[in-house]
Amino acid sequence: MSRMAFDRQKIVEAVKEAKARAKPRNFTQSVEVAVNLKDIDLKRPENRFKLEVVLPHGRGKDVKIAVIADGAVAEAARRLGLDVISSAELEEIAKSPRQARKLAKKYDFFIAEAPLMPKIGRYLGRYLGPRNKMPVVVPPTMTNIEPIVEKLKKTVRIQLKDNPVVHAPVGTEKMSDEQLAENIEAVLNAIIGKLERGENQIRSVYVKTTMGPAVRVEG
């Protein structure tokens, strides 16, 4: 695909059509992008990737963040009104696979103090890892985690693993077409940066709402 395939106006048009074709629901639908790749051998580990992309206009909705910590980091989290999981609570959660799964599903991101990471890996790794939700690690002496929290509120995590397609939430239907298009561009640029032959390995790009049909970004 040529650079013109990602012309901003073409993305805006696809977003506009995806929103128009979405039936009204009694909730605010998310807007997602799907990027189909080609000529990539996913049996080779070096071709797989995980990415964190900061969306210029944020996700358009609240992001649930939990902090696994004691001491200074826990206090910093409480000042920001975040949910805190202490090391003692972590031990209790470890005894119940059901609780661990529920925890992994409930939150979008986790922040954890470094000394607890061995326990987190042992107790929660099997639940957080496959969901691409392993914690952002901070030192136990950190007293201000607000910059990290603010960044996470605008961040999406995406990964290329077994199938040659990358999915990413890019906002909600209440955001403007231009804001969503800029967020999509940020995701596309991040993916292109990880591909050996860049945009030439992108087969197609689709935009859709949660319950609506997929609309192709025309090249």
From Swiss-Prot:
Biological-process GO terms, alphabetical: regulation of translation; translation
A single GO cellular-component term on record: large ribosomal subunit
Alphabetical keyword list: Repressor, Ribonucleoprotein, Ribosomal protein, RNA-binding, rRNA-binding, Translation regulation, tRNA-binding
SUPFAM superfamilies to which the protein is assigned, alphabetical: Ribosomal protein L1 (SSF56808)
Entry superkingdom: Archaea
GO molecular function: rRNA binding; structural constituent of ribosome; tRNA binding
Pfam families the record matches: Ribosomal_L1 (PF00687)
InterPro entries to which the protein is assigned, alphabetical: Ribosomal_uL1 (IPR002143), Ribosomal_uL1-like (IPR023674), Ribosomal_uL1/biogenesis (IPR028364), Ribosomal_uL1_3-a/b-sand (IPR016095), Ribosomal_uL1_arc (IPR023669), Ribosomal_uL1_CS (IPR023673)
UniProt keyword rRNA-binding present: yes
Assembly and interaction partners: Part of the 50S ribosomal subunit.
Function field: Binds directly to 23S rRNA. Probably involved in E site tRNA release.
Stated family: Belongs to the universal ribosomal protein uL1 family.
PANTHER family, per the entry: 54S RIBOSOMAL PROTEIN L1, MITOCHONDRIAL, LARGE RIBOSOMAL SUBUNIT PROTEIN UL1M
Full protein name: Large ribosomal subunit protein uL1
Organism, as annotated: Pyrococcus horikoshii (strain ATCC 700860 / DSM 12428 / JCM 9974 / NBRC 100139 / OT-3)
